[in-house]
C-alpha cells in the first residue's frame, strides 16, 4: 500500500489514508501515555511493550515520510501530525530521516513545493527536535536549519514564507536563542549513551558539545 502514499500517485484515497494513519498514531500515543500513569487499570500483561512501540513506528514511518510531500495540504498536515506523535514515541527512528530529507531539500531550493513541505514539517516537529531530553542529537541541527530556511522568506511565495516564519516562531518559543559555546558541560551526565538513529549511539556530552559549537553564530538571531 505504500504506493498509494507516494506524492506522484495523488487521489482522494491519499486524504483518507493519511487521516487513517493520523487516527492510528493518535490512539496509539494516547494509550502509551495512559499506560505510563500510576493509576492505569490495564493489566501489565496487556500493556504496550517497547518492542510493540518500535514496530508500530517502523510500520508507519515510511508512508508518513512519503505523504508529507503530498500536493494535497490536508494529507500533508495529517502526515505531519502523525510524524510529530511518533517523534515523541521513538525520536531516533523519526527525526534522522526527516533531517536527511530536510537538508537535501533546503540545500536545493529549486523544488518549491518540496521545500515548503519540509519547512512546515520541521515547524511541526520543532519541539521534539530542540529538546535534548527527547532527542539529544537534535539541538546541534537547529542553527544550520535556521540559516538554510532563510531563503524561504520569499515575497513571491506567501505559503513558503508563512511556513518559514512559523518554524522560526516555534523555535523561538521553545528555546533561548544565544551563543552557548562558552557554556560548561554536565559532568557525569555527559557519559550517558543516547541513540542517534536506528543503529548508532553517542554520548550526551558529545552531543551537548556539538550543540554548543553550532550556536557560535546565534547572537545574530538574538540581537
Where are the language model's segments positioned?
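Alpha-solenoid helical repeat scaffolds
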Residues: 1-101, 110-141, 198-223
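Very long, low-complexity or repeat-rich scaffold/adaptor subunits
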Residues: 5, 43, 143-146, 154-161, ...
Amino acid at each position: 500500500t505504500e504506493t498509494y502514499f507516494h506524492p506522484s500517485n495523488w487521489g482522494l484515497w491519499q486524504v483518507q489514508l493519511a487521516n487513517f494513519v493520523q487516527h492510528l498514531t493518535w490512539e496509539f500515543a494516547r494509550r502509551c501515555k495512559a499506560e505510563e500513569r500510576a493509576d492505569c487499570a490495564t493489566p501489565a500483561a496487556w500493556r504496550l511493550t517497547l518492542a510493540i512501540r518500535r514496530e508500530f513506528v517502523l510500520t508507519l514511518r515510511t508512508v508518513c515520510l512519503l505523504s508529507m510531500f503530498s500536493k494535497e495540504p490536508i494529507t500533508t498536515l495529517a502526515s505531519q501530525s502523525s510524524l510529530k506523535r511518533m517523534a515523541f514515541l521513538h525520536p531516533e527512528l523519526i527525526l534522522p530521516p526527516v533531517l536527511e530529507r530536510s537538508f537535501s531539500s533546503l540545500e536545493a531550493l529549486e523544488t518549491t513545493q518540496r521545500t515548503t513541505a519540509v519547512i512546515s514539517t520541521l515547524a511541526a516537529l520543532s519541539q521534539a527536535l530542540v529538546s535534548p531530553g527527547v532527542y539529544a542529537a537534535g539541538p546541534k541541527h537547529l542553527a544550520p536549519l535556521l540559516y538554510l530556511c532563510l531563503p524561504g522568506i520569499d515575497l513571491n511565495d506567501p505559503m513558503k514564507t508563512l511556513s518559514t516564519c512559523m518554524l522560526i516562531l516555534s523555535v523561538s518559543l521553545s528555546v533561548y536563542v544565544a551563543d552557548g559555546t562558552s557554556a560548561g558541560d554536565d559532568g557525569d551526565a555527559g557519559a550517558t549513551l543516547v541513540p542517534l538513529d536506528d543503529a548508532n549511539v553517542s554520548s550526551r556530552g558529545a552531543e551537548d558539545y556539538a550543540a554548543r559549537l553550532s550556536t557560535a553564530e546565534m547572537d545574530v538571531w538574538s540581537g
